[in-house]
């Protein structure tokens, strides 16, 4: 199982991701593609369940985080994704503190530790 809070879902397609990938990998776009979750879903052979929580009041949502692109890739590839848009939440500690227990339970269920 995989989970994330407000991840940069398509780093090849946002300023933060492009800046980070340039710093890590230079201008070798093939290396960028090997680390972009939205692109990797197209070639994934495992279908691990994914949980993403995203606040709908997050100021980075549209330009930087772009979860809709990841959601589209998962739908296109029949990859299990639960994308939860949380009303009124931003990119803060309170957002994570509110939903961290859900993420822990998500992984515990995937591991068969709880029902």
Walk through the language-model features, giving the residues of each:
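Non-catalytic cap/lid and distal C-terminal segments of serine-dependent acyl enzymes
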Residues: 1-115
